[in-house]
């Protein structure tokens, strides 16, 4: 019994160590991702990120339980409006989900650039009248917004809530490795 508990803790309760590899999203954006992440196919992107704008980059893992994406938002902000933009994006987070438990909300400097950071757990309630979506969907999310040259670049990680502890440390490494050239 002890061995089963120990193995369960090892596989489900402790953060995993990932080999990080440099990833070039485009000519202006590089970051480190765990090596098991691979670019999503156009079909995966269309299914998981339905939008008029395709992401600059979208990556997933073989189990499809964790995703990382880089997008340019339609909202345009000046870097000097970072506090107002933070409140705007915060409201958007709370409107997007049925329940949000904010873990971290701040402006953080990463490689000389100021990012708006939201780390949170989310829940979308299930529909009791639906045969497909009865159970709530719980996810761990880490989102960073960069206001640069009149653009808003969004770096977003999410995974199933039950594997949150496995990914939190790696996500922090991903987000602090982001490098964006000024010419974007």
Language model feature labels by segment:
Residues 17-34:
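Short N-terminal segments immediately surrounding and downstream of signal-peptide cleavage
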Residues 77, 122-125, 159-163:
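Solvent-exposed loop/turn segments at secondary-structure junctions
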Residues 1-7:
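Sec-dependent signal peptide recognition
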Residues 144-150:
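A short, solvent-exposed beta-edge/loop patch
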Residues 24-25, 45-51, 107-114:
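Short, ordered beta-strand-loop transition motifs
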Residues 30-87, 91-95:
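Secretory pathway targeting signatures of secreted, lumenal, and periplasmic proteins
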Residues 35-39, 150-184:
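Surface-exposed amphipathic alpha-helical segments
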Residues 86-144:
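Signature of long, low-cysteine stretches enriched in small and polar/charged residues
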